[in-house]
Amino acid sequence: MLLSCGLASQQSFGWQEQAPVTESAPAPDEDWLYLQNTDLRIGFLRSHGGAVAYLSPVDSKVNLLNHFDHGRLIQQSYYGDTDGSLWAKEPWRYNPVQGGDYQGSAAKLLAFTSTESSAYAKTTPRHWATGELLNECIMEQWIELRGPVVKLRFKFHYAGKKSHGQRHQETPAMFLAPELRTLVTYDQDKPWTDGPLSRRIPGWPNEYVAMTESWIAYVGEDGRGVGIYVPEVTEATAYRFQGGSGSDCSYVAPLKTFALTPELTYAYTAYLTLGDVETIRARFAEIVKEQP
């Protein structure tokens, strides 16, 4: 999205709903919700649209994600046409974001429920640049722990009257700790044949990457990190930002290209896992085998 929410600018289903929660920021001890099992721990911020803001092995207290602002999370973000809006004094576009806007205003959390191994959020997003609550948009998120894998389901409904042009859409945007520097994927033409993986350290701004096996990962110096698999998505965008003061991050987003048009509903599934790249690839290969 943006420098903060994804696509960088050099100028930069149905669970039962609960009563809407207040728009005011929760107290710190009420803001976070964590789920964990014997493999991993995942955390959500109510003040950021219920988006995923924490991920680690269960025996670690080191967050592998970056949540420096309301754009840096694992979250939904979509793009429409330029609309005269300004992000930090630079031209921007129609951009509903699950977490909130660039000035720190939270999205409106309509529902947030959880069990021991799952969580659901329903959110009215904000326009990243203007901060307007976009009542014509609804974002939903279902998260489920499945052993060493996190299953994520996202759904976006756009009831606006304007038809926007086609854009690259983040599915989803994912911001990671800057220590995870190396981007790893398979980018050749023989997927799931144990072919050699490609490795790179992205720069700034966005680089576009083929991911023929529909997964991509960032790893640290120890070769371990976070991988994401989005079925049928074969392209991603990535960058690393180094701005200091906690803003350093590694970013990646699998990409689909489509337009926001009246009464659009777009839903997709993604999977996360932790480990070295061989383990990450093997776990995603098992998911592929299970698919019809």
What feature does the model see in each segment?
Residues 1-8:
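Bacterial N-terminal signal peptides
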Residues 15-40, 47-48, 62, 68, ...:
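Beta-strand-rich recognition/accessory modules
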Residues 34-36, 43, 120-122, 142, ...:
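Residues within well-ordered beta-strands of beta-sheet-rich folds
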Residues 84-147, 161-163:
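Extended, loop-rich substrate-binding clefts of extracytoplasmic carbohydrate-active enzymes
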Residues 171-174, 179-242, 250:
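Active-site/ligand-binding surface loops and adjacent short beta/alpha elements
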